[in-house]
């Protein structure tokens, strides 16, 4: 400190000018105060900068959180819309499948194919074959007669009815094909597999949202550590 510094003369030369000791002590005292003031000001500025940085960090974090919340809400709404869309597509696919199968069983070649398979699988005894077909198959009567004569060695009786069923019998053997039942069964099989689609979409939605939440937590924690 200044009081421990020996000053042999009441006057000290400073840049060739004699300055009294009291004036010199008063000068150094003022200088110390200025230094302390500068140091304190620097400390206050440093603390203010740290506080501002902290406030910016929390403000950014709060804004980031709100941004993530908004994003999550939008993603959730989007994925929910996708689930709704999945249900609509399921209904459309079932309608399309029903139309497709109905058109297939109504096609003349389908009747001929079914009869051809039946005739091949039936035992061919000497008994008479009875065949009852939908009346709309009458337009293919000639083709049916050729098919029966080529594949059935015995006699046969062919008639038509107003129902949609194909019925063929010989002795104790009988076969029946219902286009309506076939269509319903086929559509039911497709529906069974499609029923898993909304659940798959829901699982994807949950996984996507959880992944976004995890990412948000990771980034938020990283900002806090900084």
UniProtKB/Swiss-Prot annotation:
Its main location: cytoplasm. The keyword Hydrolase does not apply. One of its GO terms (biological process) is protein transport. Disruption phenotype: Deletion of the gene disrupts proper SpaO/SctQ localization. Keywords: Cytoplasm, Protein transport, Transport, Virulence. It is found in: Cytoplasm. One of its GO terms (cellular component) is cytoplasm. The core secretion machinery of the T3SS is composed of approximately 20 different proteins, including cytoplasmic components, a base, an export apparatus and a needle. This subunit is part of the cytosolic complex. Interacts directly with InvC/SctN1 (T3SS-1 ATPase) and SpaO/SctQ (the major sorting platform component). Forms homodimers. Component of the type III secretion system (T3SS), also called injectisome, which is used to inject bacterial effector proteins into eukaryotic host cells. Acts as a regulator of the InvC/SctN1 ATPase activity. Required for invasion and secretion. This is SPI-1 type 3 secretion system stator protein. It comes from Salmonella typhimurium (strain LT2 / SGSC1412 / ATCC 700720).
């Amino acid at each position: 400190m200044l009081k421990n510094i020996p000053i042999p003369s009441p006057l000290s030369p400073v840049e060739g000018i004699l300055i009294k000791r009291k004036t010199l002590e008063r000068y150094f005292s003022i200088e110390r105060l200025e230094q302390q003031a500068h140091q304190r000001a620097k400390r206050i500025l440093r603390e203010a900068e740290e506080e501002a940085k902290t406030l910016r960090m929390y403000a950014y974090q709060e804004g980031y959180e709100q941004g993530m919340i908004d994003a999550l809400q939008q993603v959730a709404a989007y994925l929910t819309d996708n689930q709704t869309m999945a249900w609509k597509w399921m209904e459309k696919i079932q309608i399309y499948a029903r139309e497709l199968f109905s058109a297939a069983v109504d096609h003349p070649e389908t009747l001929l194919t079914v009869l051809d398979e039946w005739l091949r699988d039936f035992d061919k005894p000497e008994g008479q074959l009875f065949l009852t077909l939908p009346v709309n198959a009458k337009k293919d009567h000639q083709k049916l007669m050729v098919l029966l004569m080529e594949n059935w060695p015995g006699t046969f009786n062919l008639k038509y009815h107003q129902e949609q069923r194909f019925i063929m019998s010989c002795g104790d053997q009988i076969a029946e094909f219902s286009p309506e039942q076939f269509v319903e069964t086929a559509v039911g099989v497709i529906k069974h597999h499609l029923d898993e689609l909304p659940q798959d979409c829901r699982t994807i939605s949950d996984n996507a949202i959880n992944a976004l939440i995890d990412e948000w937590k990771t980034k938020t924690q990283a900002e806090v550590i900084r």
